[in-house]
Structure formats: C-alpha cells, structure tokens
Amino acid sequence: LTMIDDFDIVHNRKDLPPELWEYFKKEGFFALIIPKKFGGKAFSAYANSTIVSKLASRSVSAAVTVMVPNSLGPGELLTHYGTSEQKERWLPSLAKGDEIPCFALTGPEAGSDAGAIPDVGIVCRDTFNGEEMLGLKLTWDKRYITLAPVATVLGLAFQMRDPEGLLGDKKNLGITCALIPTDHPGVVIGRRHNPLGMAFMNGTTQGKEVFIPLDWIIGGPEFAGKGWRMLVECLSAGRGISLPALATASGHMATKTTTAYSYVRHQFGMAIGQFEGVQEALARIIANTYQLEAARRLTTTGIDLKVKPSVVTAIAKYHMTELGRSVMNDAMDIQSGKGIQLGPKNYLGHPYMSNPISITVEGANILTRSLMIFGQGATRCHPYVLAEMEAAAMENQHEALERFDALLMGHMGYATRNAFSALFSALSGSRFGSAPVSGETKQYYKDMSRISSALALMTDLSMLIMGGDLKRKEMLSARMGDVLSQLYLGSATLKLFEDNGRQQDDLPAVRYVMANRLHLAAKA
C-alpha cells in the first residue's frame, strides 16, 4: 500500500506508475481467481473481496485496475467454459500479467443489456493465416470498457448469426462470447474515457468485419449461442464481490478517519465530536460500516459455497453501494473543508467523487432495485412457484396434472400457514415466536420471522392478483424487494454478531442496524 500515491495517480499521471503495474503483474494481483495449475492464486471470493477492499481504502483507481481482471472477463470465462487448448494458451499468460484482459459487453445504444446486443458475428468462409476456413466476421462498437485502452486480449459478447446455414438450420444462434488478441487486424482500441476523473483505464473498442476462426469462441464452436448463460452465471457472482468490496472499503476508511478527526478537530472551543449533530452522523457511519462488513462476509461466503446467489448478489450490489454513498456523504459533512480541498493529504475526495461509478456499473441501481431483486426472487426463491411452472410445462399431461395438483395443495397450505403466522405475530408483537438464540438479540429474530411471514403472504397475493404483470409493476416490485433486502441485511448483521462471539462492544452497532432494518422493512 505504501507504493500507492493516489493523488499522484489521479492528478499527475492519470495512470498507475509503471512500477505499480509491474508489481501487480509480478505478485499475481491479476490472477486471484485463476487456478493454481495455470499459475494463478485460486483465491476464494472472500479473499478476492478482502484484497480489493484493502486496495480501495488507499486508491479506488488501483482497486478497480485489480478488480476487473478478477471479475467478469476472459480469466473467469476461460476457467469455467474454455477448452483445454484455450486454457493452456491464455491462463498462464494472464496469471503472469503478460496478457492484460478486458471484456466488452456495454455498447452505445443497448448499454449493458445483454439481450439487446446489436454487435454481430456472421458465420462465413474466409482466409486466416493463408488458409481458408469457417469463421466469423465480427462488427462491434463498445464503450465504457475497463482496461480496454491497454488490453492485449479482448473478450467480446455479440449476436451470432448463420444466414447461409453453414453450421446447420438455425439462423440466429444467439449471444456468443469470443476471445480476440487486440493486435489482430481490424481490432481498434486505445481511446480513453474519463470516468469522473479517476485514473483507471476505461475506453472504447470497435471492429468492422473482423474475421476470426470459430475456435476463438470461448468454449469452442459447441458453445456458439451459449453466451447468455455464461454471462448471467458469471455476472451474478461477480456482482456480489467487487463493488460491495469498494463500498465496504469506503466504510472502513470513513470510520477510521472521521472518528479520529472528530476528536482532534476543535470548533468553538471543543472537539467537534462532542456536538450531538456530529455524533448522529458518526453513529450512522459506524453502524453502516458494521452492516457493510456483515453483508460482505455473508455474500462472499455464499459465492464460495457455489450457491450462485443471483438474488443475494443483486441485493448486495444495490444496498451496499448505496450504504457506501451514505457513509461518504456523512464523512464529508463532518470533515467539511478538509474533505473538499483536493491534495495529497485528502483521503476523502477521490472515494467521494467515484461513488456514482459504483452506483452505475454492473446494473444501474435504480433498475437493480425495481427489476432485479424481487423480479428474480419472486420465482427463484419461492418454494412452489418454480416447481409449479415446471410441472405445467411437462409433456406427459397425466403426470403433469398429478404433479401440479400436489404442488398446488402444498402451496395453498404454505400460504394459509403464512397468513395465520403473520396475523398472530403482528397481534402479539412477535412475543411468542421462536428464536435460535437468547439474550439481547433474541427479539430481532422473532421480528424478522414475523416480517418474513408477511412478505411471503404478500408475495403470494401479488402473484395471484397480478400474475405475469407483477414484473412490470416496478414500484410494487421495488418495495417488495426492499422488504426482502432488509431481511437479508438484518440476517447478515445478526450472523456477524454471532460469528464474532457476541462481543458486547458491537451491541450498540447491532441494535442501531437492526432497528433501522426493521423500520425500513415495515415502511416498505
């Protein structure tokens, strides 16, 4: 960390210094998720998150530079889906830093909506290295691609089409991902964006009728058209690692510096930490940081358990980046003039300026809240609905009817139990509910169970009344998602308290967080 001078990086160099680039390559910072047999570190999601968070406490630009190769990109896609030849060719070079990767998904018109990618690859015959072969002619225009200006290998998402039927009867094969060296003829990189003044490399890439062999498709020709599944599976995991790590770093840094500042900075003859207005903001910073760390640990643990928690990672991405923004706002309010004057000793300015980047990327927060959290969770997390849909789609009608009837009866019983449980818990104030622990946090478990029953009941009612229109009722979906999110964040907080041995010093933060979570859930 002592090698990192964020003011010099952002204001003077507009880039990481060469010695820092070399250090990151040499020490394997770009190979955190690459398997050991290819020279990588094979670190867990928790370790990956911890490293990114530590770097971000010093420099957002340095953290993003390390974070991107270890998130969605060539390294992860090759590890999960690459052929043995592709893995042998690329992973050792990526692990050593000889190759710098980027992944191009976002475009000028479609944004990061993978389903609306306009970039296209047409199956055709052409010459490559003096030999005629079957391949793809790619045309693309991408923007906002981190590391694109310096990348040596480009991961590209595009729509694959076979109008002449060279591969079979199917004309539109769907979203496909390919790996292309950036020195390949026709590939254009180098132009830089300026993401709120931060110094990490971010820019555009284009290509027009660039011919590549079919073997350059990640996973080989048999993975043609399977890019959607690849992107969804990898994005759902990565969304819960990198950006939540940046948000948690903001919390830790703000807590450490602002608590100290509030007691050394004097105003009107007394430390500003003695003013109740400042104490109120400090309480929010400390409690929100506790919440951030709790959610970071639980989310990355789920990813390490191979649960692929797409709903949970959407919750983490949205709420943790929003909490990070809240923490930085409070820290800036307390440190005031010190925070707004940029210079080598200003540790708040750059994290504060970069907040909108975390809010925007990997699914803009406003859409994550209104479309993704409950929109995905209503079906994925329901104990009966997904199974009922699968039963209805079965080809054997007799078997389908028997299966559906059994599920429907179970569903009705489930809804009835939730209705009575929610009503009884509400009337009794959750006093007669059960809890897995005793002591100071016992009531929080009971209250969470009451809200969980109420959410389950409201989910069933919403799905019954609105059916398929529920996803389009974004404001309702957002509020239902808020309840689900508060339950998850509250669970993470209680788990961290238990994991840390029920430390009494943590109890004020736990009480603050849980009171806030329960209030927000009730409000939603």
Question: Model-found features: residue ranges?
Answer:
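Amphipathic, small/basic residue-rich leader segments at the start of a protein or domain
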Residues: 1-69, 85-89, 93-100, 112, ...
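Terminal amphipathic helices with adjacent charged low-complexity linkers/tails
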Residues: 264-280, 498, 502-505
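Glycine-rich phosphate/cofactor-binding loops in nucleotide/flavin-utilizing enzymes
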Residues: 227, 339-441
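C-terminal helix-coil-helix/basic helical segment that borders enzyme active sites and/or dimer interfaces
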Residues: 8, 290-321, 332-335, 339-340, ...
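Flexible, small-/acidic-enriched active-site or ligand-binding loops
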Residues: 185-211
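A glycine-rich, basic-preceded beta-loop-alpha segment at the flavin cofactor/substrate interface
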Residues: 204-239, 256-273, 297, 418-439, ...
